[in-house]
Amino acid sequence: MSYVALGVDPGLLRTGWAVVEYDGLCNVRYIDSGIVKTASQGSLSARLEKIHRGISDVIEKVNPSVAVLEKVFVNNNPYSSLNLAYCRGALILTLALKGLFIVEFAPSVLKKRITGNGRATKAQVKYMVEQLLGLDPCLSKYSDLYDALALAASVTRYDIMEAKGT
C-alpha cells in the first residue's frame, strides 16, 4: 500500500514543507517541497493566516495521506517558544480541518531516525536527507526545508497506525 506524507517544520518566519511518496516496498520518493515565508513586521494573525493558506494550498495540490510535525520544544527565549507554539497550533488546526492524521516527532527522535544519532547537527540531517532522497545539495539554503523533508521521510506505516489508534 502506497501513501503520501507531508512533513511540516513549523516556524513563524519560515515554515518548511515537503512531500514524499512511499511505495508498498518501503521505497521513498521525493515529490515536492518549499517554504512559506511571512513578513517579520506583519501582525501575528496575518502571519498565521499566510501559513494556513500556504499549507492548505499544498494539501489541495498533493492530497497527502498523513502529515508529520516536529514536536514543540522550549528554548532559552520564551518569546520564540510562544511564537512557535502559535504556529504549531495554526498548523495542527489546518491539518485537522483537511482531515489529515498527524504524526509528531521530538527533534531528537527525528534526528535519530534520519542519521542514527539523536544529537545530529543540521548539516548531518541535510546530508542524510539528500542521500536518502537523491536530492541536489543546492535544493535550498533553508534548514526548515530539510527538516520538513526529514519529517516526511521518517514516518512509517506503524507511526500512522499508532496515530490513528489502530
From Swiss-Prot:
Mg(2+) 1 binds at D9, D144. Keywords: Cytoplasm, DNA damage, DNA recombination, DNA repair, DNA-binding, Endonuclease, Hydrolase, Magnesium, Metal-binding, Nuclease. Binds 2 Mg(2+) ion per subunit. GO terms for molecular function: crossover junction DNA endonuclease activity; DNA binding; magnesium ion binding. The RuvA-RuvB-RuvC complex processes Holliday junction (HJ) DNA during genetic recombination and DNA repair. Endonuclease that resolves HJ intermediates. Cleaves cruciform DNA by making single-stranded nicks across the HJ at symmetrical positions within the homologous arms, yielding a 5'-phosphate and a 3'-hydroxyl group; requires a central core of homology in the junction. The consensus cleavage sequence is 5'-(A/T)TT(C/G)-3'. Cleavage occurs on the 3'-side of the TT dinucleotide at the point of strand exchange. Homodimer which binds Holliday junction (HJ) DNA. The HJ becomes 2-fold symmetrical on binding to RuvC with unstacked arms; it has a different conformation from HJ DNA in complex with RuvA. In the full resolvosome a probable DNA-RuvA(4)-RuvB(12)-RuvC(2) complex forms which resolves the HJ. This is Crossover junction endodeoxyribonuclease RuvC.
